[in-house]
């Protein structure tokens, strides 16, 4: 994400010495206008300008569409409100709870949901939801956002996620709850032609232009690029962010090089346009207060107050600790690791690079079904393979699986795959990513998927080549 933003936002650098603006004279008319009551700061003025520009662009495009393409124009609108959709979420939650087994993990998840429900009517502002992997963060954050929106008559929920793998998973859950006609996916891997209903397909295509949908799931790049863009196509959607809830999932993945302008933008949107922001992750970054750098320009001016939804006494990290990391200081060769993996019928092996994954994959025996996962695969192939893995794990069918992703981006963090080590079938599933990140997901649904050898101690491995 950081590289993409650098390429797009820093393509034309502007030196401070090149700018000659008399701020008092330039904004004297604005200061004397009714807008002065909003106390817009100089640093935030460009967000107000861009928001007004968004209103103008969308109104102009819609009027033109009504004149030039009335059939498309008629397909817009007639959308459900969040108030209309809330009963569907309640029904889904109730059904989920009634069918859930009485386990420790499920009791903790219910506790988290109840806490989110209790705090949802709080005033608009910045909130954080810190829940370890497996604690039901996705549904709990959705419940909080929905009830918060209903309490404050807010327009829509926008969920921004760093990785398309998680977006596909989250959007699938949301469509299951609310129906595909109420959930908009907006990212590079989404193909509107996958929507079977023609009316819903056409509405989704049109909605990507201005985000006129009750629930939007998009990427961080799409969101923040639009907030700082000067292009009509990017800015057109911005006015529909006003009076909305912005859920930033896996917030620790925000690029540090752009953290200050991102935080400044969020503060501006909260103050001027009435949004609420929910930061969700298992490991919250420090986004509040003032962090002094080596010089004044390096100071980080964070958000003044972020309210954590889950109190410390819940001790969720202790209660949900499911994996004990035992660092193996002894280097292993690919052949040794492959031989160890081959001893078990169903194994998840996490390695660190694509090269490691390929070397290990080539050394695994062919006495089963081999499956390969990579972030280099095209989206259709990737989703097909993930679906096959889930089916094999669910049905207990023999499989010999290997998957890998970009080790530097952690593209599989937050992705849900459930299985267990002991099995009568031969299933070996290897994934290349951060061992520490992925080990947190190895018992997300009450089943063990271990990193090295099928034991209950995950051991990130070092290869000697």
Residue ranges and their predicted role:
Residues 1, 399, 430-465:
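Conserved segment of the helicase C-terminal RecA-like domain
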Residues 154-178, 187-190, 286, 354:
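Conserved Walker A/P-loop ATP-binding site and its immediately adjacent core
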Residues 179-228:
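Inter-Walker segment of RecA-like/P-loop motor cores
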Residues 123-145:
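Walker A/P-loop
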Residues 185-200, 352-356, 370-390, 404-410:
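Conserved helicase motor
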